[in-house]
Amino acid sequence: VESLMNLSSLTLTLERSLYTRLRARADRRSLLPPHLLTGQRGEDAAFFHLRALGYTIVARRWHASRVRGDLDLVAWSGTTLVVFEVKARTVRDLAPAAAEVDHLKQHQLRKLASAYLQRLPEAHRPSVRIQFDILSVYLLPTGAEFEHIPDAFPQVASTNRF
């Protein structure tokens, strides 16, 4: 009887442990620092906002193996491949969120977009127009507000070279 009670206690402990781990895995966001949580919430809001506007989202948080950083959202709008840099805030500051996309960030996004383009069939690459947009997401108590800057910065050359 005592060994049966020990087994029952062990089973209950394992079930609690498994439940705790599964819950933490399902809601990893609770473990994130506030600024990363805001970023993920902003990217999620941007995803649904852009889908509602008719964009076809083909990648989220896309990473290249040899280029630092990621592409927040990649979408098709007609025949244009749009790379979205999402900037999320919980308050509106004097400086817009989009102001953080400086020349270094633009260079990084161009390199990542070039790496992403290599995934497309080679025959189609020259005809793909790439556009870099910035989407600022303000996560306010009254709901999310969006500021979209289409074609925020140009490609370096006209042949899909960044």
Task: Please state what every model-predicted region is.
Residues 3-13, 120-162:
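Domain-level recognition of nuclease-like catalytic cores that cleave nucleotide substrates
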Residues 88-142:
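Catalytic cores of nucleic-acid endonucleases
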Residues 1-42:
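Interdomain/boundary linker segments immediately adjacent to catalytic/signaling cores
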Residues 37, 41-45, 104, 108:
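A generic alpha-helix signature
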Residues 46, 50, 71-94, 109:
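Conserved catalytic cores of phosphodiester-cleaving nucleases, focusing on short active-site segments
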Residues 66-68, 142:
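Short acidic/glycine-enriched loop/turn segments that link adjacent beta-strands
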Residues 57-59, 83, 132:
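Hydrophobic residues on conserved beta-strands that form the core of alpha/beta folds
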Residues 52-66:
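A short acidic/basic microdomain associated with nuclease active sites
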